[in-house]
Amino acid sequence: MAVVSLSEMMEAGAHFGHQTRRWNPKMSKYIYCARNGVHIIDLVKTALCMNNAYKWTRNAAKGGKRFLFVGTKKQASDVVAQEATRCGAAYVNQRWLGGMLTNWTTMKARIERLKDLERMESSGSIAMRPKKEAAVLRRELERLQKYLGGLKGMRRLPDVVVLVDQRRETNAVLEARKLDISLVSMLDTNCDPDLCEVPIPCNDDAVRSVQLILGRLADAINEGRKASNNEKN
């Protein structure tokens, strides 16, 4: 049984690629045709890739692997946070800060700083400071929450990065590959499938398409973790 049906993908607009002049030739095997100057993705192949991605992700979760969802474009931001939270994964949905993976020691210290500031705010410690100092601390807290809030539960580097729009998240791709971290990537027709272990050819711009794909991957992670817990018990 398919993880995601052709009708679901059609309704979500998962088959719409980019303009033909913006394509990456390496995506040709996933393209069905071109209409009105736009590439149409072969959803039969997307369904096969999703079956593979679901199985791969489920097995990774069952094996105790840690996941990081990354998608910083506006239309993906809320979905990334929602689905990552639902399956207990870390996420980056605002801006990829250089060194988030390759300079993990420094990034981890910034996350601890965020936690400290949150404790200070909730305890009323910041409110007791002089007005100017309190304002500075709250601005720092707001900035750290915006960019690092989704990483608070990430104590170590992830084993798998799940990407929305591989082309946009170039720095995340480079850092993950440098550290041999596996990539599960939603790939539009302008992407390079050779850069990831688990490709999912689909429209990475439409909110419903992103919701559909990330939702299934989150399901796979939850299912894998549940299977792992059942085996332990």
From Swiss-Prot:
It comes from the Bacteria. One of its GO terms (molecular function) is structural constituent of ribosome. Keywords: Ribonucleoprotein, Ribosomal protein. PROSITE patterns: RIBOSOMAL_S2_1. InterPro entries: Ribosomal_uS2, Ribosomal_uS2_bac/mit/plastid, Ribosomal_uS2_CS, Ribosomal_uS2_flav_dom_sf. The keyword Transferase does not apply. GO terms for biological process: translation. GO terms for cellular component: cytosolic small ribosomal subunit. Belongs to the universal ribosomal protein uS2 family. This is Small ribosomal subunit protein uS2. It comes from Prochlorococcus marinus (strain MIT 9312). The gene is rpsB.
